[in-house]
Amino acid sequence: MQVWSAASGAPLPPDVRWALVHATVDAPYLPLLQRLGAAGVTVFGCTSFRGVFVPSGFERGAFALLGGSDDPVASSVRRNTDALGARSAARSAVADLRRGMPKPDVLLLYATPGFEERVLEGIHEGFDGAPPPLYGGSAADDDLSGRWRVIAGSEAISSGFVLVGFTSSRPVHGSFVAGYNPGTRRGRVTSASGRTLRAIDGRPAAEVYDEWLGGTLKELRATGGVVLSHTTMHPLGRAVDRVGAITRYVLTHPHRVERDGSLALFTDVAEGDELVLMVGSREALFDRTDQVAARAGRGAGAIRGGILVYCGGCVGVTGDATSQVSTRFGARIEHAPFLGAATFGEQGCFTGPSPTNRHGNLMADAILFE
């Protein structure tokens, strides 16, 4: 595997079989997709928030991780769909994928934001309730304006997903981490619909959440509005399972308070879910880069390449120091080539006795290939 920059002007290496492409929305990536497609390369990827993670740092532009004949085999399926059709589209995508690759070692998913859970449900059903471990992220742009795109072949999809299966003669590893700690505040969802959280413990959700945050949302609660700058360090966590003494959480990012007292979220929640106020720090967002690489690489041999997915909301916090994410990830995988995207949602597998693929926010996931 090797990382290749569209801006370098260098010729494509010989024997490229597949290309993972990450790009900022202002980069001229469509000619790159056409060039790769003309060479018979399987192409997949997404647009990324403010930059792309490459071994040299966090840079704007279009970049590709190229796989050759000695690397894992990749097969991809795309679907243009919306929320209503996403579940059935995912089932049909799996059926198409399995015709040429009955049981991938790992799945990579890139979707446009808004209906990731429906896609995961369809994938689960398509694999008869036992899908391979899945990792990936939700396409992003620079300002939540909807310019995000999923990359599939020579196409940039504004609503849909691309599902990639990898098979390899060598082990493939993955991990999915939160990097936030549970606090003492918690409550149970008593009214919710999809990504709208209306009530916690019988009270308006925005009122309860603001109380947990110490009143920082008081003015916005009166008018309604975007609260991302107030909530990135305090997402809502839902326990997935326990491994030994450790409870593992999937995170939900509240992004808006409504005048009716509800919270708009970037994931689904359900009535009966217990929510925990999670606590993060800027340094912890860097530390979890080490965690995601170390957990994926635990017991692994030499790494030949990797894929990193890191939440765009966290990039808003790490700011000018975001290149440290690339530096630390690269060091952990002993400077093997890798490519990463800053996304508006993350998908990953909680491995263990009962593996489960989930969609979350403010998280990080990785795939490492031996």
Language-model segments: residues:
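Small-residue-enriched flexible segments
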Residues: 1-42, 46-319, 323-336, 341-370
